[in-house]
Amino acid sequence: MSHRLPPPLQPGDRVYAIAPSGCLRSQLIRGRSELDAYRQGVEIWRQRGYCVEIDPDCEAQWGYLAGTDAQRRQQLDRAWQDPGIKAILCARGGYGASRLLEDWVRPQTDSPPKWLVGFSDITALLWSIYNEGIAGVHAPVLTSLSAEPDWSVRRLFDWVEGRTIPPLQGRGWGGGTVCGTLLPGNLTVATALLGTKVQPDLEGAILAFEDVGEAPYRIDRLLTQWR
């Protein structure tokens, strides 16, 4: 299956913030609250010239989730159905996106595909649209954007605005050269999606996993599941 990139963004475009996973917490983490970090992330997009609109339920809370499943599905629907919205910005990861996919079908519209921006738990949504031939961007959520180094923020905006970006940094353990479709994802979330309808066709895919705060034995267990 070939995958379409959404049209490049331009300053002045409308972008929409949603919280499809965990709720925004007010307690301090490393000296600041997630709410503060989220608002700083919104401000970075606004400083780039984008019209950031925030879903009315974006700061909702239902236990550890950002509202009930129905509320969070409605956030997704509002974002996808508005033809003027060019990108969907996820507020944070955590947990909860995969719950939405049990009873949610992306609204079909005549407009071009939108950018879906996020990582961590947002992997479930990114892989869901990947199955429809739409490429998203595995990138910082709003709560983490302001903590990113300048080069990382530049790379995000260069990519969604249609500019060429330099090759990925780092070196693989196994060596060699491969060619395929790059499919990033959170290791824990991606492993949970194995064997479900959301699991993409992995033939020819180059998997790029991320995770944080997991003990080595848990990483070992998760990777073993992929053998």
Model-identified regions with their sequence ranges:
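ATP/NTP phosphate-donor binding region
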Residues: 1-84
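Internal helical hairpin/lid segments
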Residues: 201-227
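Conserved anion/nucleotide-ligand pocket segment
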Residues: 134-195
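Short glycine-rich anion-binding loops that position phosphate/pyrophosphate groups of nucleotides
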Residues: 23, 92-95, 214
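Short, acidic/small-residue loops that bind anionic groups at enzyme active sites
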Residues: 104-129, 135-142
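N-terminal glycine-rich "phosphate-gripper" loop used for MgATP/nucleotide binding
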Residues: 88-98, 119
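Structural motif
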Residues: 87-89, 117, 206-208
